């Protein structure tokens, strides 16, 4: 069977496969999980893109995991060098347009799924980026609060300063900055749902004089002629697109006053790879993970002086596990509202 033959390349960890009433063992040792194949995955799909073929098969329940899904994912994703990928078949997914109109649609497809959906499994602050766990027993809500205030401390804010948040999400960081430091905050987003929720929060807290959020592309901010004492961008760079990185850094440089500070928080990749086709099709259309070296290089090209670099890798692992557990707690609600295939996609 080609499916079994193909899966044998992932033998770094031991697991079993059930197919046509037979059980096969792959790798040596004690099996960590069991892959149940309810329907064969076509050979051409596996050879075209392993991640897309396996991901879509899981969504359809053609493939199920008996045991811990996270362990299974770690097993396969630690062996991505064995994945097949015919780039010529997925040009629209791997090399999408990075124009303003295209990226607006890409952002909307993910962030405009509805505030009710994200509220089910994010913490009350609606922070959708890596948290910061000061203590082992910090809750997700506390860790997200820690993260935002850690960022604000690094920016050395003072009352009366102006703060720009590029890709401000639901506005939590700007609101906290205004409340604690009395700064004037301005945020931009391409998500109508985020903008709507952000506006509601600002009005509820009576912060209209200090915080403003607009539905606008960061590339249009320079034309407004304003500059800021501080700029922050959290979890937005991943949506910019590799061809736009130079423009993004140049834009930040233009928008920052002389002597100002820019804090950039993002998910980094080990290298400049094009990414995972399944993730780019279903979760983050147009999403790309920049490497640290390319962003640092671009920063110096735009006359930034890099004074601090910090990896939050271990914190992101904990953040993801918190989100996963929260999602599992409301999974039945998600299935009732959006169907099982959608829920399995988000598993």
Locate each region found by the language model.
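Feature captures hydrophobic
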Residues: 1-144, 150-154
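Conserved SAM-binding loop of SAM-dependent methyltransferases across substrates and taxa
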Residues: 170-181
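Conserved SAM-binding strand-loop segment of SAM-dependent methyltransferases
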Residues: 205-219
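A short acidic, Gly/Pro-enriched loop at the edge of an enzyme's catalytic core
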Residues: 219-231
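Substrate-binding/catalytic lobe of Class I Rossmann-like enzymes that use SAM or dcSAM, i.e.
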Residues: 267-347
């Amino acid at each position: 069977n080609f499916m079994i033959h193909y899966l044998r390349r992932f033998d770094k960890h031991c697991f079993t496969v059930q197919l046509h009433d037979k059980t096969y063992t792959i790798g040596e040792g004690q099996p960590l999980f069991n892959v149940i194949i309810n329907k064969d995955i076509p050979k051409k799909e596996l050879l075209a893109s392993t991640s897309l073929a396996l991901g879509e098969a899981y969504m359809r329940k053609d493939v199920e995991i008996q045991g811990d899904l996270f362990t299974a994912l770690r097993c396969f994703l630690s062996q991505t060098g064995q994945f097949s990928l015919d780039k010529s078949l997925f040009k629209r997914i791997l090399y999408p347009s990075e124009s303003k109109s295209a990226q607006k649609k890409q952002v909307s497809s993910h962030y405009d799924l509805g505030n009710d959906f994200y509220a089910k499994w994010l913490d009350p602050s609606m922070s959708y980026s890596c948290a910061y766990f000061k203590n082992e027993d910090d809750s997700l809500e506390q860790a997200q609060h820690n993260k935002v205030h850690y960022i604000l401390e690094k920016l050395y804010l003072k009352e009366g300063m102006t703060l720009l948040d590029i890709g401000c999400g639901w506005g939590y960081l700007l609101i906290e900055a205004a409340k604690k430091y009395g700064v004037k905050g301005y945020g931009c987003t391409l998500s109508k749902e985020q903008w709507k929720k952000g506006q509601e929060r600002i009005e509820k807290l009576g912060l209209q004089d200090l915080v403003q959020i607009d539905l606008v592309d960061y590339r249009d901010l320079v034309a407004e002629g304003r500059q800021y004492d501080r700029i922050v961008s959290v979890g937005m760079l991943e949506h910019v697109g590799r061809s736009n990185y130079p423009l993004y850094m140049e834009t930040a440089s233009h928008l920052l006053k002389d002597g100002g500070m820019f804090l950039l928080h993002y998910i980094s990749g080990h290298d400049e790879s094009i990414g995972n086709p399944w993730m780019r099709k279903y979760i983050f259309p147009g999403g790309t993970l920049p490497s640290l070296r390319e962003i640092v290089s671009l920063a110096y090209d735009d006359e930034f002086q890099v004074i601090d670099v910090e990896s939050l890798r271990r914190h992101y692992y904990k953040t993801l596990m918190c989100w996963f557990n929260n999602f599992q707690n409301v999974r039945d609600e998600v299935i009732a509202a959006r169907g099982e295939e959608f829920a399995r996609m988000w598993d």
